């Protein structure tokens, strides 16, 4: 009843809601940009889309880019959906990192309600064996995604543009108005990808004596400051914190 009265969300009587008043949402692009800017202020250099190959000679990694050659004693790799492309440039033996890729879509809907300015929050809503998630309208409409649907792909080329499949609008649009009755027409959609480890959790481990990997889970940008600190400490000490190793080691997959 309170969900309907306060937020105009229609659910059955067996639903209950939890409101977390001290939470919010993160702009992914801005958070990544902020992290890069902070790193540059500390002396980091950025090269985008330039690594051609990485080899290892006498314990030193030699990184060949399109325009230069870099030598390093240690490497930290943080990669998402296309991790195997990144690891594929390494010309030495590494354990396989089992990360798949799911093509995902999100939809926007026009509305005069569900606005950030009206106090409407970001949300997660259970639905069958899945859940909808989304964000209030603060510019382009109510943004809605659905967690477990989407096509399993293996290459960038298979991440086709929005609208290539009928399900790009049906997976969300077929049911979402049952819960949000004030939604108007579908406005637009976009495509992204989820990296998928076998147990839907991070993989954090040494792949080589001085090559440390973090990845395997979507939305890693939210945890980037903590993951970065963890990775640097692991390389400095040459060991992984036992609590991290227990839950996130690559060895858990056998």
Where are the regions a protein language model picked out?
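Flavin (FAD/FMN) cofactor-binding and adjacent substrate-gating region
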Residues: 1-43, 47-49, 53-59
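A short alpha-helix-loop-beta-strand transition element characteristic
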Residues: 1-4, 12, 94-99, 185, ...
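Short loop/edge segments at beta-strand edges and connector loops
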Residues: 47-50, 65, 188-190
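Short, hydrophobic/aromatic-rich segments at coil-to-beta transitions
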Residues: 59-63, 119-122
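C-terminal catalytic lobe of FAD-dependent flavoproteins
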Residues: 178-254
């Amino acid at each position: 009843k309170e969900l309907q009265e306060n937020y105009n969300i229609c659910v059955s009587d067996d639903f209950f809601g939890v409101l977390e008043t001290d939470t919010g949402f993160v702009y992914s692009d801005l958070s990544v940009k902020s992290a890069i800017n902070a790193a540059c202020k500390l002396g980091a250099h950025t090269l985008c889309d330039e690594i051609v190959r990485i080899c290892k000679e006498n314990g030193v990694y030699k990184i060949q880019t399109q325009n230069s050659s870099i030598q390093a004693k240690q490497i930290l790799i943080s990669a998402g959906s296309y991790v195997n492309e990144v690891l594929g440039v390494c010309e030495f033996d590494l354990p396989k990192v089992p990360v798949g890729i799911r093509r995902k879509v999100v939809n926007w809907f026009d509305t005069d309600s569900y606005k950030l300015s009206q106090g409407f929050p970001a949300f997660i809503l259970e639905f069958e064996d899945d859940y909808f998630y989304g964000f209030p309208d603060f510019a382009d409409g109510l943004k809605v995604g659905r967690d477990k649907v989407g096509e399993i792909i293996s290459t960038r080329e298979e991440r086709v543009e929005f609208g290539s499949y009928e399900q790009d609008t049906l997976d969300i649009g077929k049911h979402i108005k049952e819960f949000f009755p004030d939604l108007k027409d579908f406005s637009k959609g976009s495509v992204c990808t989820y990296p998928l480890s076998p147990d839907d959790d991070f993989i954090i481990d040494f792949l080589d004596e001085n090559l440390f990997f973090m990845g395997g889970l979507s939305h890693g940008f939210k945890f980037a400051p903590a993951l970065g600190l963890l990775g640097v400490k692991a390389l400095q000490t040459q060991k992984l914190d036992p609590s991290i190793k227990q839950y996130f080691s690559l060895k858990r997959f056998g």
